[in-house]
């Protein structure tokens, strides 16, 4: 897929023509016209678990009793159920059951380090299901008042290479520790002793990829809203037990950690990382912001693309509405509606003559200058050399018709017009003269693990196939 992916160039009001995949942060921060979309509904949660999919619905649990869930991964509401209260849970599907780990007390607050990490099972996460029933929780890790570790902030990993189950736990007030659990029972493996793997972080999570084990930790201060300095850091190791080392060779046992994400875009305190793999090449990272300034300063669920660069996890871009060039990875040509190229007036002295007149800027071609000559009705779409002309600038806005994990469905049209990009039953794309709200005009936009983007219609006419916008040939867009 990589050869044919589509990526974007963003037209920022201040810094125009930034390529998102190489300068996304610059483009986002320089734009004052649009805000990045955030989860909608009731996404309010603190210390969220890794997102789990159960019977077509998404669930995440937080500190306190319960959590939030979503039908589509975009609109969230309360109602997820987790007994036991406690703090900072995690959830992992093993076979046809869900293992939930959580902590009771602990945290190093008030000078006490006493606490327990417990696990319990359920066949489903849907509280309305007749199969919904948690098993009795069992203690798998503990800490004492005077211990140099807190039994809190559980993180689960089922090693895909060995089938062994691991739990990390601990806080900023001591060591992060690793213990092994029995994947059949969720109990501590008999005789297993904890291993110290990090300091100066908490809310850890373990993941595996390409021969590396990664330890994601949350560094900084929590629970202070807009003043929280939480940020997510990472180290990696060839062995699950460490040592975990960052990008400059510092061990996490010595306080090292490569930054993954920090405060940004009027949101502070990212923490409690979780990884969600949708399919090969499409990954998401979930976490909370301690304070989202645009949502009353509340602690909220956040979902970002998870990218991989040089075998390091990287937080992807927060995609937001705006005007873009849609450019092919295959050749670098831009998506455009198939209209005649209108030449601009040229009043320039020959390049070999020394200028005799004051230099005068050339104004870009405007929509008003060319639109009257465009054909009415449906128009074909093609790929061509990018010339920043009106028929190559695409306005991408939320459609207000639901979403998917981490984003809303978008509508895409030529800027300043009602010519909307539409999928056809022939696996083609055209521009229709109006927005009907049909599934073929609702677009799912996701950043892939390599930093490029995938654009998919919500549904194709006459088929259930999931297809993406690609460059079939240098000049031929299509859906495949």
Feature locations, PLM:
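Secreted/periplasmic carbohydrate-active enzymes, especially glycoside hydrolases
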Residues: 1-2, 35
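Bacterial N-terminal signal peptides that target proteins for export
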Residues: 3-22
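Bacterial N-terminal signal peptides
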Residues: 19-32
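Carbohydrate-active catalytic/glycan-binding domains of CAZyme proteins
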Residues: 36-349, 354-368, 376, 385-403, ...
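Extracellular/lumenal glycan-associated surfaces
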Residues: 329-342, 414-427, 457-476
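Aromatic-rich beta-strand patches that line glycan-recognition/binding surfaces
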Residues: 350-351, 379-384, 429-434
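Short polar/acidic secondary-structure junctions
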Residues: 401-402, 435, 460-461
């Amino acid at each position: 897929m990589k050869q044919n992916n589509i990526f974007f160039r963003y037209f920022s009001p201040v810094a125009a023509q930034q390529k998102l995949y190489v300068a996304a942060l610059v483009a986002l921060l320089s734009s004052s016209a649009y805000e990045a979309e955030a989860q909608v509904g009731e996404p309010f949660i603190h210390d969220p678990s890794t997102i789990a999919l159960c019977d077509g619905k998404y669930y995440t649990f937080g500190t306190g009793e319960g959590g939030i869930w979503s039908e589509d991964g975009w609109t969230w509401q309360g109602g997820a159920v987790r007994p036991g209260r406690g703090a900072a849970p995690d959830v992992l599907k093993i076979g046809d059951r869900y293992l939930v780990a959580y902590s009771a007390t602990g945290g190093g607050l008030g000078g006490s380090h006493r606490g327990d990490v417990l696990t319990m099972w359920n066949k489903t996460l849907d509280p309305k299901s007749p199969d919904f029933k948690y098993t009795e929780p069992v203690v798998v890790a503990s800490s004492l008042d005077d211990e140099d570790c807190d039994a809190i902030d559980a993180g689960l990993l089922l090693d895909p290479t060995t089938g062994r189950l691991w739990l990390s736990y601990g806080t900023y007030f001591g060591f992060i520790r690793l213990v092994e659990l029995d994947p059949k029972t969720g109990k501590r493996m008999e005789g297993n002793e904890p291993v110290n793997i990090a300091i100066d972080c908490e809310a850890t999570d373990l993941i595996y990829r390409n021969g590396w084990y990664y330890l994601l930790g949350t560094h900084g201060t929590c629970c202070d809203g807009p003043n929280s300095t939480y940020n997510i850091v990472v180290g990696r190791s060839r062995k699950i037990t460490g040592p975990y080392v960052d990008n400059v060779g510092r061990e996490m046992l010595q306080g090292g950690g490569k930054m993954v994400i920090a405060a940004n875009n009027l949101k502070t305190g990212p923490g409690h990382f979780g990884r969600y793999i949708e399919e090969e090449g499409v990954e998401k990272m979930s976490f909370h912001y301690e304070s989202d300034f645009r949502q009353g300063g509340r602690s909220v669920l956040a979902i970002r693309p998870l990218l991989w660069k040089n075998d390091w996890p990287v937080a992807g871009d927060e995609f937001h509405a705006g005007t873009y060039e849609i450019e092919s990875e295959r050749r670098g040509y831009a998506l455009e509606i198939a209209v005649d190229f209108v030449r601009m007036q040229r009043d320039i002295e020959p390049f070999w003559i020394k200028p005799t007149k004051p230099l005068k800027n050339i104004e870009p071609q405007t929509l008003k200058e060319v639109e009257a000559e465009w054909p009415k009705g449906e128009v074909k779409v093609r790929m061509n050399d990018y010339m920043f002309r009106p028929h190559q600038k695409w306005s991408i806005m939320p459609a207000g018709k639901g979403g998917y994990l981490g984003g809303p469905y978008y509508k895409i049209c030529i800027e300043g017009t009602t010519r909307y990009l539409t999928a056809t039953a022939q696996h083609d794309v055209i521009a229709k003269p109006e927005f009907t709200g049909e599934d073929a005009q609702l677009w799912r936009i996701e950043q892939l693990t390599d930093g490029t983007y995938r654009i998919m219609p919500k549904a194709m006419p006459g088929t259930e196939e999931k297809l993406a916008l690609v460059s079939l040939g240098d000049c031929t867009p299509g859906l495949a």
